[in-house]
């Protein structure tokens, strides 16, 4: 009887061990499934985070490019503004200088029409001459310069040809007579010199 009891107990113990092992295997299987689910979710989350990181990096790159472009645009605007201010400063007198040119022309005509040697007009001539020199000196301080090309080669950028005449005294395309002087303001042409050009 004790053998049978021992066998029954052994069978019972074996069954209990098997059920415990099966339970553990089931638990391990569910733990593995749970771990696999967690791993899959973690991988999915990592992919989402990597995608979000790439989008954020793309946004950062785009914003960095926008900042660089904006800084370059600001520099360009600053440079253009400085150039515009410099031009405005240099050429603010242009309209005023244009109004003064007829006064200078009239003084030169007065000098040309007055006899410097005649006793009656000598004092007037000297007075107009001094006034003209003083006036020219004053306007030169502000960048106004006379263009008097007598005897120079004709330059269409600075001179306006009134006509051409044959001449043995001057080479071809040489200014042989200045009808009206030209003027520049800070090296920019204000009025071309009216000239007669030699044909040669």
From Swiss-Prot:
Which Gene Ontology BP terms does the record give?
Answer: protein folding
Write down the Pfam families for this protein, in alphabetical order. GrpE (PF01025)
Q: Where, per UniProt, does this protein localize?
A: Cytoplasm
Q: Which domain of life is it from?
A: Bacteria
For this protein, what is any one GO molecular function term?
protein-folding chaperone binding
What keywords sit in the KW lines? Answer: Chaperone, Cytoplasm, Stress response
GO CC annotations, alphabetized: cytosol
Q: Which CDD domains match?
A: GrpE
Stored Gene3D superfamilies: 3.90.20.20, Head domain of nucleotide exchange factor GrpE
InterPro entries referenced in this protein's UniProt entry, alphabetically: GrpE, GrpE_coiled_coil, GrpE_head
Q: Which family would the database say this protein is a member of? A: Belongs to the GrpE family.
Record's function text: Participates actively in the response to hyperosmotic and heat shock by preventing the aggregation of stress-denatured proteins, in association with DnaK and GrpE. It is the nucleotide exchange factor for DnaK and may function as a thermosensor. Unfolded proteins bind initially to DnaJ; upon interaction with the DnaJ-bound protein, DnaK hydrolyzes its bound ATP, resulting in the formation of a stable complex. GrpE releases ADP from DnaK; ATP binding to DnaK triggers the release of the substrate protein, thus completing the reaction cycle.
Subunit structure and binding partners: Homodimer.
Can you say what this protein is called?
Answer: Protein GrpE
Instruction: List the gene name.
Output: grpE
């Amino acid at each position: 009887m004790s053998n049978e009891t021992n066998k029954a107990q052994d069978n019972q113990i074996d069954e209990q061990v098997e059920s415990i092992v099966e339970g553990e295997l089931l638990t391990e299987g569910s733990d593995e499934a749970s771990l696999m689910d967690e791993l899959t979710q973690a991988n999915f989350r990592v992919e989402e985070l990597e995608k979000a990181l790439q989008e954020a990096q793309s946004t950062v790159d785009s914003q960095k490019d926008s900042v660089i472009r904006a800084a370059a645009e600001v520099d360009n605007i600053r440079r253009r503004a400085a150039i515009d201010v410099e031009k405005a400063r240099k050429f603010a007198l242009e309209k005023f200088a244009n109004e003064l040119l007829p006064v200078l022309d009239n003084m030169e005509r007065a000098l040309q029409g007055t006899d410097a040697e005649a006793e009656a007009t000598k004092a007037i001539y000297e007075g107009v001459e001094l006034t003209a020199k003083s006036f020219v000196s004053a306007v030169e301080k502000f960048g106004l310069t006379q263009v008097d090309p007598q005897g120079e080669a004709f330059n269409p950028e600075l001179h306006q040809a009134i006509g051409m005449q044959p001449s043995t005294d001057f080479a071809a395309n040489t200014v042989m007579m200045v009808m009206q002087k030209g003027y520049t303001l800070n090296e920019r042409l204000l009025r071309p010199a009216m000239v007669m050009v030699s044909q040669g």
